[in-house]
C-alpha cells in the first residue's frame, strides 16, 4: 500500500505544466515529470483532449521543454539532446529522431530552444548557437541550403551594422568582422593511430632445451625448437610530427603447438669468442599441443560445463618509426606447464612429451645430437607488429572567425534573433522584407485635388433625371411606348473652385468642368495606394549620378560610368562559355529599363536575355554591375568599387572585393549565388569550406519588392533605400541591456533595461495592424520607443505573434496591441481585462487561431477558434475569452482518487467500482461520477444523495442489500473503521 501511496503522490507532483507551445493546429505542454501532452489535429485526426505523446525509447532522460513549428514538435531533455517529433508523419507511428546530440558536439549540452514558423534555434552550455529546419529566408545559414534536417552551427562571417540615425532607411557598413583575426594553429599533440591484427598458424617463439651437445662442433649449448600458434592483438599508438610511434599493444594467445614435419630451429652456444647461433633443419614426428584455450567459454551458472583454459593475455609497450616492424614480447605465466624432455642415445634424438603426446626431434643433415644433461626447459614467445601509420603531414591552420559570446536566442516566423553579451542584436531572416509605408498612408489623389478647396456646382433643373416614369415594357414592339434614354449635357454645368487659404497670387481659380473631370479621371486611373505595407510604385529608382543625397552625411562620389545587366540566362551562358556576350547601350539618367520573361526593353530597344547588357553613361566614374533577375521576376545586382553613396543603396563599403546585390524578387538559392559569383569573378571564393560566405568575396543581398522596371535618376525623393539583407545578419545596437525580445511577423519588440533606469520598449519593423503599439499603422525602419507611461508599471516580458503583441507588467497585468480576431484591436497597448493578474502569466503561445497562457502556478488558460480541439476542452466550440484548461487539474484529481483508494480498506476499495482508466472528457466541473465532493455520487447534490431539500434517499448507500444479504442495507464496517455516510 505504501508503494501505491508514494506512486500517487509522485503523479500529483509530476502533473504540473512547466512549458507550453502551440501552432496553427495543435497545442502541447510539458509537465514537471517530463511527460509531453498534445491536443488538436494529430496524425490527420482531431483530438479534442490532451493525450500523452508516446515517443520512443531513444529519448533518454526527462523532457524539460517543448517548442512547436508548423508541423513538428521539438523536445529538449535534461541530457542536453534535442529531438524532432513529426506527429503528422504518414505512417502508423510518428517519427522521433535526434537533431542535436551532445555526443556529436564534444559533450556540449543544449540548454535552451526557441522555434519559429519552420525552424528552431538551440543554445548550448558553451554559448554556441545551432539551428535546424527551414532555411528558406536564410534565417539559419546565410547562402546555405534550403533546409537542415540536423542541427548546424550558426557562424557569423560578416555583419551589416544598422544606423538608426537614418530615419527613413536602413544604412550600414561592414563592421568588426571585415578583417577577421585568424589564429595560428599550434599542433603540439600527437595523432592517434590504431594497430590491429588476427593471426593464425604463425611462428611465435621457441622451446629452449639447454645442456644439449651437438656434433659438430661438439659443443654444449641450447637447442631451440620452433613453436607455432594463434594470436590477435590491438593497440593505439601516438604518432608525433616526426613519424615516431609509441604506445601499447594488448595481445591474446589461444593456441600453442609444435608442428609435425620439417622445422627450422637453431642451436646457440657460447665460447671465448662470443655467442654463436646456428640454424638447424629439424624434423618432428608428431604434432604436440602445448596450450589450447577454450574458444567458447561456458557460462558461470552452467555447473555441468567443463572447465577450460583461459587465453594468454597481456599488454606490452612498443615504439618505432612509422612503416617499420617492431617486436612485441609475450609474458608467459609463471605456472605455465611445459613439455618434458628426454634423450634417446640410440637414435640421437630428443623426445618432447606433453599430456601423453610425444614427438621426436631429430637434426637433419646438419649435425647429430650426442649428449644431454637433464635441465629445465624454457618457453620464449614474441610476435612482430608492423607499424602501419604515417607521419602527419603539415596541416594548414584551421580558419576560425572570432564569434560573439551569445547570451540569448529568440525566434519567430522566419526570423532568428541572437543577442551577445555586449547587448548587440543579430537578426537573420525575413526582416529584409520590411520598408517604410509612411508615404502610402498619406491622403489620396482625390483628397489632394480637393484639399482646402471650396467647390460649388451649378446646373439647370432639367438636367436631373427625377421624373416618375411608368415601368418600361421591353416587350412592346411599338417604339413610341419606350422611354428615351436620359442623357445629361455636361456643357450646361458650371463648377466654381475657390482657394481662400492659398498663398498664391490668385486667391481664387475658376476651373472648367472638363479640366476638373480630366483631373478626376487622372486620379481614378492612378494606381491605388491603400494603407498597406507594399509599395505602390512599381519603379525601382537608382541615383546614379551627382550628389546622391545620402541622409547620413556621407561624401558625394563621382558620377557612375557604366552599369552592367545580367540575368539567369546570360549568367548560364557566361558560365558555360567562360566568356560574356556583351551588348552596349548608351543611356542617360532618364532611361527606363523594362523587362519580361522574353527580352529587355531599354528605351524601346529590344535585347535578348542571353546578352550581358552594358549601360554606358556619358561621364566616367565607378563601375557598377547590375543583374536583373528575370524569372522571379525582377532584381538588380551590382558590384561597387567606389566611395559611399555612388549608387542609391544603403549598404556601403570601400573595398572592391564587396559585391552588392539588390533583388526585388525572391531569395536566390545557393546555385544561383554560385553562378553569380562566377560571373562576377573567376577567382576562388572559398578559403575554407566551413563558411558559405567567404570574407574575401563578400556578396551582400538586399531584398526589396517592386515592379518590372528600373529608372535611373539624379535625385528623387522616392528613392527606395533598403539595407537589411538576408545573406548576412543585421546588427542593431541599443546601448542598453537586452532583457527580452518579442519576434513577430517581420517586426521586433525589444525590452531593454539598465542600472537605476526603468525598462523601456523599442520596436522596429512591420506595423500594418498596429502591433508595434505606436498608435499608427506605419511600418518603421528605425527604432522607435514606446511611451512607458501607458503601462501601470514597468514591463517585464513581451510576447509577439502575427499582428499582435502582448506585454506583461511587474504587477502581472497583461497589455496588448495590434489585432487578434475580436479579442484585441488597438494600435496602442491596452490592458486586457479578461486576463486576471492573479493568474501571474509567465508564458504565452500565440497563433492565428488560438492563444495559450501559462500561469506561474502551472495553470493553463486558452481562447480561440478551437475548431480542431486545439484547446483540449473536450469540445470544438469557439472560446472567446480566456478559459481555464482543466485537463491537468483533472489529472491531479485522478491521482488524488488513486491516493484515496490506496489509503482505503481493501473491502471498501473493491466496492467502489470506479477503478476505470482516466478519461478527462467524462469529468464535469467537479470531477465526474467517481470523484469526491458535493457533486460526487455520495454528496448531497449527487445522484445518490438526498438533494438540497430532501432527506436521505433510498439509494444514498451505494452498496445494495443484494450484495450483503446478511446485513441488509447496512454497509460492511470492519471494526467500525470505515464511516460510511461522511467518508468524503
UniProtKB/Swiss-Prot annotation:
It is found in: Virion. The keyword rRNA processing does not apply. Keywords: Virion. SUPFAM superfamilies: RCC1/BLIP-II (SSF50985). Residues 941-984 are annotated as: Disordered. Coiled coil: none annotated. Its main location: virion. GO terms for cellular component: virion component. This is Uncharacterized protein R345.
Amino acid at each position: 500500500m505504501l508503494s501505491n501511496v508514494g506512486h500517487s503522490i509522485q503523479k500529483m507532483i509530476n502533473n504540473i505544466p512547466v512549458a507550453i507551445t502551440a501552432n496553427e493546429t495543435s497545442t502541447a505542454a510539458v509537465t514537471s515529470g517530463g511527460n509531453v501532452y498534445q491536443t488538436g489535429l494529430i496524425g490527420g485526426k482531431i483530438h479534442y483532449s490532451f493525450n500523452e505523446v508516446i515517443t520512443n525509447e531513444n529519448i533518454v532522460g526527462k523532457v524539460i521543454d517543448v517548442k512547436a513549428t508548423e508541423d513538428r514538435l521539438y523536445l529538449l531533455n535534461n541530457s542536453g539532446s534535442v529531438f524532432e517529433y513529426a506527429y503528422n508523419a504518414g505512417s502508423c507511428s510518428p517519427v522521433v529522431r535526434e537533431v542535436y546530440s551532445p555526443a556529436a558536439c564534444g559533450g556540449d549540452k543544449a540548454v535552451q530552444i526557441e522555434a519559429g514558423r519552420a525552424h528552431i534555434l538551440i543554445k548550448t552550455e558553451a554559448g554556441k548557437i545551432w539551428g535546424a529546419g527551414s532555411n528558406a529566408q536564410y534565417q539559419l545559414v546565410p547562402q546555405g541550403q534550403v533546409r537542415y534536417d540536423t542541427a548546424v552551427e550558426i557562424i557569423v562571417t560578416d555583419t551589416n551594422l544598422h544606423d538608426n540615425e537614418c530615419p527613413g532607411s536602413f544604412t550600414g557598413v561592414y563592421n568588426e568582422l571585415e578583417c577577421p583575426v585568424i589564429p595560428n594553429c599550434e599542433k603540439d599533440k600527437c595523432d592517434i593511430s590504431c594497430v590491429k591484427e588476427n593471426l593464425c598458424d604463425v611462428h611465435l617463439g621457441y622451446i629452449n632445451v639447454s645442456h644439449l651437445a651437438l656434433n659438430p662442433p661438439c659443443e654444449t649449448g641450447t637447442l631451440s625448437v620452433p613453436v607455432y600458434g594463434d594470436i590477435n592483438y590491438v593497440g593505439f599508438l601516438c604518432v608525433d610530427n616526426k613519424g615516431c610511434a609509441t604506445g601499447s599493444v594488448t595481445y591474446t594467445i589461444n593456441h600453442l603447438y609444435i608442428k609435425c614435419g620439417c622445422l627450422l630451429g637453431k642451436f646457440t652456444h657460447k665460447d671465448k669468442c662470443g655467442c654463436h647461433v646456428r640454424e638447424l633443419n629439424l624434423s618432428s614426428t608428431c604434432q604436440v599441443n602445448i596450450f589450447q584455450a577454450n574458444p567458447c567459454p561456458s557460462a558461470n551458472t552452467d555447473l555441468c560445463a567443463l572447465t577450460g583454459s583461459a587465453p594468454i593475455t597481456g599488454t606490452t609497450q612498443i615504439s618505432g618509426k612509422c612503416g617499420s616492424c617492431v617486436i612485441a614480447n609475450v609474458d608467459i605465466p609463471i605456472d605455465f606447464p611445459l613439455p618434458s624432455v628426454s634423450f634417446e642415445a640410440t637414435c640421437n634424438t630428443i623426445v618432447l612429451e606433453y599430456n601423453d603426446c610425444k614427438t621426436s626431434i631429430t637434426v637433419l643433415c646438419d649435425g647429430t645430437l650426442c649428449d644431454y644433461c637433464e635441465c629445465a626447459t624454457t618457453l620464449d614467445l614474441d610476435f612482430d607488429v608492423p607499424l602501419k601509420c604515417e607521419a602527419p603531414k603539415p596541416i594548414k591552420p584551421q580558419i576560425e572567425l572570432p564569434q560573439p559570446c551569445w547570451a540569448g536566442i529568440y525566434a519567430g516566423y522566419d526570423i532568428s534573433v541572437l543577442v551577445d553579451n555586449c547587448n548587440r542584436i543579430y537578426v537573420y531572416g525575413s526582416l529584409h522584407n520590411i520598408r517604410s509605408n509612411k508615404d502610402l498612408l498619406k491622403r489620396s489623389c482625390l483628397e489632394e485635388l480637393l484639399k482646402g478647396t471650396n467647390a460649388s456646382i451649378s446646373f439647370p433643373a432639367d438636367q436631373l433625371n427625377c421624373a416618375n416614369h411608368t415601368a418600361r415594357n421591353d416587350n412592346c414592339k411599338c417604339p413610341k411606348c419606350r422611354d428615351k434614354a436620359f442623357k445629361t449635357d455636361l456643357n450646361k454645368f458650371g463648377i466654381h473652385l475657390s482657394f481662400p487659404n492659398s498663398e498664391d497670387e490668385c486667391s481664387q481659380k475658376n476651373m472648367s468642368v472638363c479640366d476638373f473631370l480630366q483631373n478626376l479621371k487622372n486620379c481614378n486611373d492612378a494606381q491605388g495606394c491603400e494603407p498597406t505595407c507594399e509599395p505602390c510604385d512599381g519603379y525601382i529608382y537608382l541615383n546614379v549620378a551627382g550628389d546622391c543625397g545620402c541622409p547620413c552625411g556621407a561624401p558625394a562620389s563621382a558620377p557612375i560610368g557604366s552599369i552592367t545587366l545580367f540575368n539567369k540566362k546570360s549568367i548560364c551562358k557566361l558560365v558555360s562559355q567562360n566568356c560574356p556576350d556583351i551588348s552596349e547601350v548608351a543611356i542617360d539618367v532618364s532611361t527606363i529599363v523594362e523587362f519580361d520573361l522574353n527580352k529587355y526593353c531599354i528605351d524601346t530597344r529590344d535585347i535578348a536575355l542571353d546578352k550581358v547588357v552594358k549601360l554606358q553613361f556619358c561621364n566616367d566614374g565607378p563601375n557598377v554591375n547590375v543583374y536583373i533577375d528575370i524569372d522571379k521576376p525582377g532584381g538588380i545586382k551590382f558590384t561597387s568599387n567606389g566611395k559611399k553613396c555612388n549608387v542609391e543603396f544603403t549598404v556601403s563599403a570601400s573595398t572592391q572585393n564587396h559585391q552588392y546585390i539588390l533583388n526585388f524578387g525572391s531569395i536566390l538559392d545557393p546555385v544561383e549565388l554560385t553562378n553569380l559569383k562566377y560571373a562576377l569573378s573567376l577567382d576562388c571564393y572559398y578559403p575554407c569550406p566551413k563558411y558559405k560566405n567567404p570574407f574575401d568575396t563578400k556578396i551582400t543581398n538586399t531584398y526589396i519588392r517592386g515592379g518590372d522596371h528600373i529608372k535611373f535618376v539624379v535625385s528623387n525623393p522616392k528613392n527606395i533605400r533598403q539595407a537589411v539583407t538576408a545573406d548576412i545578419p543585421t546588427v542593431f545596437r541599443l546601448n542598453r541591456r537586452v532583457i527580452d525580445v518579442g519576434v513577430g511577423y517581420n517586426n521586433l519588440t525589444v525590452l531593454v533595461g539598465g542600472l537605476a533606469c526603468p525598462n523601456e520598449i523599442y520596436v522596429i519593423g512591420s506595423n500594418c495592424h498596429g502591433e508595434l503599439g505606436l498608435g499608427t499603422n506605419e511600418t518603421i525602419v528605425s527604432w522607435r520607443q514606446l511611451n512607458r507611461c501607458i503601462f501601470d508599471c514597468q514591463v517585464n516580458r513581451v510576447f509577439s505573434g502575427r499582428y499582435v503583441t502582448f506585454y506583461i507588467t511587474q504587477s502581472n497585468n497583461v497589455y496588448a496591441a495590434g489585432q487578434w480576431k475580436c479579442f484585441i484591436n488597438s494600435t496602442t497597448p491596452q490592458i486586457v481585462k479578461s486576463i486576471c493578474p492573479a493568474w501571474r502569466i509567465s508564458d504565452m503561445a500565440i497563433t492565428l487561431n488560438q492563444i495559450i497562457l501559462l500561469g506561474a502556478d502551472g495553470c493553463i488558460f486558452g481562447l480561440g477558434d478551437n475548431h480542431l480541439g486545439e484547446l483540449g476542452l473536450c469540445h470544438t466550440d469557439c472560446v472567446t475569452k480566456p478559459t481555464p484548461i482543466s485537463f491537468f487539474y483533472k489529472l491531479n484529481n485522478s491521482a488524488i482518487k488513486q491516493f484515496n483508494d490506496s489509503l482505503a480498506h481493501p473491502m471498501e476499495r473493491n466496492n467502489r467500482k470506479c477503478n476505470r482508466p482516466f478519461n478527462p472528457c467524462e469529468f464535469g466541473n467537479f470531477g465526474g461520477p467517481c470523484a469526491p465532493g458535493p457533486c460526487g455520487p455520495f454528496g448531497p447534490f449527487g445522484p445518490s444523495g438526498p438533494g438540497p431539500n430532501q432527506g436521505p434517499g433510498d439509494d444514498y448507500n451505494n452498496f445494495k442489500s443484494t450484495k450483503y444479504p446478511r446485513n441488509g442495507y447496512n454497509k460492511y464496517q470492519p471494526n467500525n473503521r470505515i464511516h460510511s455516510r461522511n467518508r468524503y
